Swiss-Prot record:
Localization in the cell: Nucleus
Expressed in which tissues: Expressed mainly in actively dividing cells (e.g. central cylinder of the root tip, young leaves and vascular tissues).
Highest taxon of source: Eukaryota
Organism in which the protein naturally occurs: Arabidopsis thaliana
Subunit structure comment from the entry: Interacts with APC/C activators such as APC5, FZR2, FZR3, CDC20.1 and CDC20.5.
Protein name: Protein POLYCHOME
Record InterPro entries: POLYCHOME/GIG1 (IPR034590)
Gene induction: Expressed in an S phase-dependent fashion.
Amino acid sequence: MPEARDRIERQVDYPAAFLNRRSHGILLDEPATQHNLFGSPVQRVPSEATGGLGSIGQGSMTGRGGLVRGNFGIRRTGGGRRGQIQFRSPQGRENMSLGVTRRGRARASNSVLPSWYPRTPLRDISAVVRAIERRRARMGEGVGRDIETPTPQQLGVLDSLVPLSGAHLEHDYSMVTPGPSIGFKRPWPPSTAKVHQILLDITRENTGEEDALTPEKKLLNSIDKVEKVVMEEIQKMKSTPSAKRAEREKRVRTLMSMR
């Protein structure tokens, strides 16, 4: 039985073949209609045959049917290293992205971002920090005005007349309600702004009452009166047209959110 054709050993002069290829030869496959088993796989193509391959440089291969099978290089016009792609191997560096390939004299970057990702410089946030500090300073000033020592006109004095260990105190206890600070928004309703006047009225009423009541009883009576007057003021505020309108708008918003 004859030996298979693909197992027949052929002596090929590889140094001569590669030398011919590096000079100006083109590696050709055997035509589909011819099978030269004893010829050299490297053939020299005439110059007229390579006339139509102007854009393909040396080292190309033409396969069966005259089609180009590979392209080892592209002819470049002009001299110098400008515009050529340089491949640098990241020796001794780990976790390097493919961004080490650069054009020209560009420096390699260690960034994990791709080359097409827009890189912007660090923005100056000092203006934002100053604005935040100014806002905090204003809020601190408002809180300070809200808890600062009130003027004598804003004081509402409640004479407690509570003896301590059988002796009167040198200084009377006073309940202080500071006035509304300018430019500071209070979270409570405007009805509580009349607490100052309410406390004054209760103090005047207590002076005319009997002194037989204990201090605890007087305190409880004062708390009940203040609570009663404040609730009356709140009810009056709720009965105003603006309050009714606000309540209706609130209900409408609640119903619309449930749709």
